[in-house]
Regions:
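Serine endopeptidase catalytic core focused on the charge-relay Asp
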Residues: 104
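Bacterial N-terminal signal peptides
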Residues: 7-15
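Short, conserved active-site loops that position catalytic residues or coordinate cofactors/metal ions
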Residues: 69, 100-101
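Positively charged n-region of N-terminal signal peptides that target proteins for export
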Residues: 1-4
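Sec/Tat signal peptide C-region and signal peptidase I cleavage site
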Residues: 16-20
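Acidic, polar ligand-binding/catalytic clefts
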Residues: 73-99
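Exported/periplasmic ABC-transporter solute-binding proteins
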Residues: 21-51, 55, 60, 64-70, ...
Length: 267
């Protein structure tokens, strides 16, 4: 019997062929902090033989990574910024995947009384009137953009606030930790709050205003702008993210019996 002896180069080729394909996906810190990635990524690997490398940043930075061609796709939650990204030719299309909502967290004693507010604008007005400590992410993330728009809708200018308003320039988890340490108010996405372990004396005080709706969307980077991006893999991932299996995993992801996201992709 003849034995096949492989040279070093051939061995490397075979070894590379056995490895899963890889792509880079920029995701928000709120998505990462929710823990959902730990559920989805192993199933993506199993079904597609695809390793998805996450770059965890705020929405603003994720969009800049996409504009630079440093990632193959983005998963973010700021529709206005996403539409500008598409209008600039940086993405091929926007596909809504899932949603949750933003919530206002604060000290259990609720000195500003926001638990009884009629809407988000009133809750923020009461925090401002009380001069109660408030932590802002201050990082150009989707959550930060939404927070600023809510202050503006309430007729308030965050840039003019006093020392009670603290912009920390950090992700959702770090900002929640700061709020916990300061016993301060903060706006969070519901998923990050539910998965947050250092709640201390904080509690969910206000939710339910329709303006707090929080949509996540997936956008592949345009290969006509950046020929090196792995557009084929990005499209494979998109089709998986809108599949029945992804829907079941997303809708079934719960903490203490409470769902963190609702799948709403149109197929």
């Amino acid at each position: 019997m003849k034995r096949l002896v492989l040279g070093a180069a051939a061995s490397l080729v075979l070894a590379s062929a056995a490895l899963a394909e890889e792509m880079r996906l920029a995701v928000t810190t709120s998505f990462h902090n929710s823990g959902l990635a730990e559920v989805l990524l192993p199933e993506i690997k199993k079904d597609l033989d695809l390793d998805v490398q996450l770059l965890v940043v705020g929405t603003g930075q994720a969009i800049r990574l996409g504009e630079a061609g440093d990632v193959d796709a983005i998963l973010v939650h700021s529709k206005k910024a996403e539409e500008a990204f598409l209008a600039g030719g940086h993405g091929t299309r926007r596909r809504e995947i899932m949603y949750n909502d933003f919530v206002f967290i604060g000290p259990e004693g609720d000195a500003a009384g926001i638990a009884g507010a009629e809407d988000a604008a009133e809750a923020l007005q009461q925090i401002a009137d009380a001069g109660a400590a408030f932590v802002s992410r201050g990082d150009d993330s989707g959550t930060h953009k939404k927070e600023l728009s809510l202050w503006a809708s309430a007729g308030l200018d965050a840039e003019a606030f006093g020392p009670w308003y603290r912009a920390v320039g950090a992700g959702m988890g770090a900002a929640l930790n700061t709020a916990s340490g300061m016993d301060a108010y903060i706006m969070s996405d519901r998923a990050s709050w539910l998965n947050f372990g250092n709640k201390g004396g904080l509690a969910l005080l206000f939710a339910g205003d329709p303006v707090l709706f929080n949509q996540y969307a997936y956008i592949p980077v345009n290969p006509e702008m950046h020929g090196h991006v792995k557009h084929g893999l990005a499209m494979q991932l998109e089709e998986w993210l809108v599949s029945d299996k992804a829907a079941a995993l997303i809708n079934g992801y719960q903490i203490n019996g409470e769902a963190l996201f609702v799948f709403n992709a149109k197929r």
